[in-house]
C-alpha cells in the first residue's frame, strides 16, 4: 500500500492504533512531520526503483527543511527530528532503529577515508550538535548528550557525553521517551 510508508510519520495516536500499542504517545508536530514524511515517501520510491524521484525528494527536504536525509538511508519506525531537524545530516547508508530521536545540528556519517557508517539501535536519543561517525554501532536504549563526538561503538543501555565521549551511566533501564514523560 502506498500510504504505509507515510503512516510511519503520522502522529503517535494514529500509529498506536494501527501499528503497535507499544509506541510512545506523541502529539502531532507540524515541525517534524513534513521532513520525515518526505523521507518516508522518498524511501518507498527508492526501494521500488524510482531513484531519481527519490533523490529529488531528498533535495526538496534539504531546501525547505535544512535536513539532509537521503532516501537510501534505512530508518526505523517512529523516527523523530527535533526542532525541524535543522542542520541535520544523515549519511545515505546509515541504519537507524525504531523510536529514535535525532535533535537539530546532528551529523551521522562516515569518517574521512573510512567506508563504514554507524548502525544505530532502537530507542536512541542523539542530542543537539552531536557527531556520530565511523564504522561503529550504537546499542539499543542509548542517550547521547548534546555536542558529543562519538567515534567508537557504544554498548546498550547507557548514557554518553563529551568530546571525546565517556559513559556516565550504565545499565539504564528507562528509554529516552519514558524519561521525557517524567520531566
PLM segments and residue spans:
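Left-handed beta-helix
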Residues: 70-71, 76-77, 82-83, 91-92, ...
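Active-site-proximal flexible loops/turns
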Residues: 111-112, 169
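Terminal amphipathic alpha-helical/low-complexity segments used for targeting or macromolecular assembly
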Residues: 1-67, 165, 171-183
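Short coil/loop residues immediately preceding or within conserved phosphate-binding loops
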Residues: 64, 85, 115
Amino acid at each position: 500500500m502506498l500510504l504505509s510508508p507515510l503512516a510511519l510519520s503520522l502522529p503517535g495516536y494514529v500509529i498506536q492504533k494501527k501499528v503497535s500499542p507499544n509506541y510512545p504517545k506523541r502529539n502531532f508536530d507540524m515541525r517534524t512531520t513534513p521532513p520525515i514524511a518526505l523521507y518516508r515517501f522518498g524511501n518507498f520510491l527508492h526501494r521500488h526503483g524510482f531513484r531519481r524521484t527519490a533523490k529529488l525528494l531528498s533535495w526538496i527536504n534539504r531546501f525547505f527543511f535544512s535536513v539532509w536525509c537521503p532516501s537510501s538511508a534505512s530508518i526505523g519506525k517512529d523516527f523523530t527530528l527535533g526542532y525541524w531537524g535543522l542542520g541535520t545530516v544523515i549519511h545515505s547508508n546509515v541504519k537507524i532503529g525504531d523510536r529514535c530521536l535525532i535533535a537539530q545540528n546532528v551529523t551521522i556519517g562516515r569518517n574521512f577515508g573510512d567506508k563504514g557508517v554507524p548502525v544505530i539501535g532502537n530507542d536512541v536519543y542523539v542530542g543537539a550538535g552531536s557527531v556520530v561517525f565511523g564504522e561503529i554501532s550504537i546499542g539499543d536504549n542509548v542517550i547521547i548528550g548534546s555536542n558529543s563526538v562519538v567515534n567508537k561503538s557504544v554498548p546498550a543501555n547507557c548514557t554518553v557525553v563529551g568530546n571525546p565521549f565517556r559513559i556516565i551511566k550504565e545499565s539504564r533501564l528507562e528509554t529516552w521517551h519514558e524519561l521525557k514523560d517524567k520531566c
